[in-house]
């Protein structure tokens, strides 16, 4: 079993929840092609501005992959402006394992996460990625921090 951190926006998190599917752009095919049924995916929602406030990055749920990767170009995901008009065609079906009542504050965990080697420039471990494999130890730390 492999553990994944899947990086998304608040808008696309709502779609994941509604449709039980994870999708990525074509350029991330190498990462998603390694996802197998039974793998566990943590959904990480990026920091965003809400009015004058900043809502920090958070982990909101755990899902299990229940399909192999498949291609579907229907436009269910919202592409951020910097990505143009991508459809996120590479997808995997999901089964919810746990949707956290209160999202996990990701920044509080950074000092203890093994996959983040540079704690000061931690965003570099996530920028430009749709998803990344994480160690089981980090998966357990994140999920044990949830309610």
Swiss-Prot record:
**Which InterPro entries does the UniProt entry name for this protein?**
EVE_domain (IPR002740), PUA-like_sf (IPR015947), UPF0310 (IPR022996)
Q: Which organism is it from?
A: Korarchaeum cryptofilum (strain OPF8)
* Organism taxonomic ancestry: Archaea, Thermoproteota, Candidatus Korarchaeia, Candidatus Korarchaeales, Candidatus Korarchaeaceae
One Pfam annotation, family name? Answer: EVE
Q: Which NCBIfam families match?
A: PRK00809.1
Similarity comment: family membership: Belongs to the UPF0310 family.
Tell me the protein's name: UPF0310 protein Kcr_0474
């Amino acid at each position: 079993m492999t553990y994944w951190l899947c990086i998304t926006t608040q808008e696309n998190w709502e779609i994941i929840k509604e449709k039980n599917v994870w999708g990525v752009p074509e350029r991330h095919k190498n990462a998603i092609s390694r996802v197998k049924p039974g793998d566990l995916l943590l959904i990480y929602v990026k920091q965003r501005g809400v009015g004058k406030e900043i809502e920090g990055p958070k982990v909101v749920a755990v899902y299990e992959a229940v399909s192999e990767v498949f291609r579907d170009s229907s436009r269910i995901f919202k592409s951020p402006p910097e990505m143009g008009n991508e459809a996120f065609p590479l997808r995997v079906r999901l089964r919810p394992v746990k949707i956290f009542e209160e999202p996990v504050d990701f920044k509080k965990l950074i000092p203890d996460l093994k996959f983040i080697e540079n704690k000061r420039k931690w965003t570099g471990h996530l920028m430009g990625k749709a998803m990344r494999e994480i160690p089981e130890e980090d998966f357990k730390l994140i999920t044990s921090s949830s309610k």
